[in-house]
Amino acid sequence: MKPNILVARAVFPQILTLLEQHFEVTSNQDDVLWTPAQLIAQLQGKQGAFTTGSQRIDAQLLAACPELKICANMAVGYNNFDLDAMTAVGVLATNTPDVLTETTADFGFALIMATARRMAESERFLRAGLWNSWRYDMFAGSDVHGSTLGILGMGRIGQAIARRGAHGFGMKVIYHNRSRLDAATESACGATLVSKTELLQQADHLILVLPYSSEAHHAIGAAELAQMKPTATLINIARGGIVDDAALAAALKQGTIAAAGLDVFEGEPRVHPDLLTVPNVVLTPHIASATMPTRLAMAKLAADNLIGYLVHGEALTPLNPQLVKA
């Protein structure tokens, strides 16, 4: 008898076909946004779940779903998982690293460019029919080439962004990370380790690429924003909650920093209302990995984790690997 799994959000048809070769599949192809109680109801009798990062897997859910053995996230981030609770009851957690690195780095750099060059502001201005003449300072932003790029969090995506900055735009690249990169990697990235204070004070464009954790909560708040240059931009493609969005909105209004570009938000999909009223911020709905090839690769990796574990007792990218058979 095939194991039963739940696909919690709509997914590529070819991925659904692949999963149906191995499992009895209950699929949410109508893409209904289930409440926690509805998710628990849907997971009854299921051994596996294909999740997308928006389904909270916590102790309460796990207690109500005793047959669950694996949750495969179609995302590199996994702050929707209570990993300790999952491990305690023997539920494997997996994610989809690596396959989205270059695509996400592309988007991060696009957001740097759009923010520095005030693209969203000028596009709104044009659509509103307000362009009637040329001015020497009309939507004059800041240069990217030759400027200082600061990176907070220097994992795979941070390194890919560093390479683009150093080798593509001739930027001085500085970074802060929990641990220093080896000398060869630093050289390949053209990056120099600095303290967090130095990063804040020196960066012309500061991009956040660190994973969310309780220690990283509000890593950028009013005090940190006050240390940045008034001409600086802040880019967040990491996770909501790393930035204090209320403090950022205030800083943008007050001119503490010049502009921001945000792909993630605290409490998303809700966006802090003050961010919606300031002109000098570029807002996108968590789409840094959103190209068709990359999203398909992410879905395929999540599916392969489900197949690998429930059929063969193995997993490609486990987050609690102690649960996988040696």
What are these regions (language model features)?
Residues M1-T94, G221:
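An N-terminal-biased, well-structured beta-alpha scaffold segment characteristic
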Residues A8, T51-T52, M74, L111, ...:
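Short, well-ordered coil/turn residues at beta-beta hairpins
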Residues I57-A59, R180-D274:
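Rossmann-like adenosine-cofactor binding region
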Residues A93, T231-A326:
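Rossmann-like dinucleotide-binding domain for NAD(H)/NADP(H)
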Residues P97-T148, A160-R164, G168, A183, ...:
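Phosphate-binding beta-alpha-beta segment of Rossmann-like dinucleotide-binding domains, i.e.
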Residues G150-G153:
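Conserved N-terminal Rossmann-fold NAD(P)-binding element of oxidoreductases
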Residues I157:
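Hydrophobic/small residue at the entry helix of a nucleotide-binding pocket
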Residues H167-E186:
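NAD(P)-binding Rossmann-fold cofactor-contacting core
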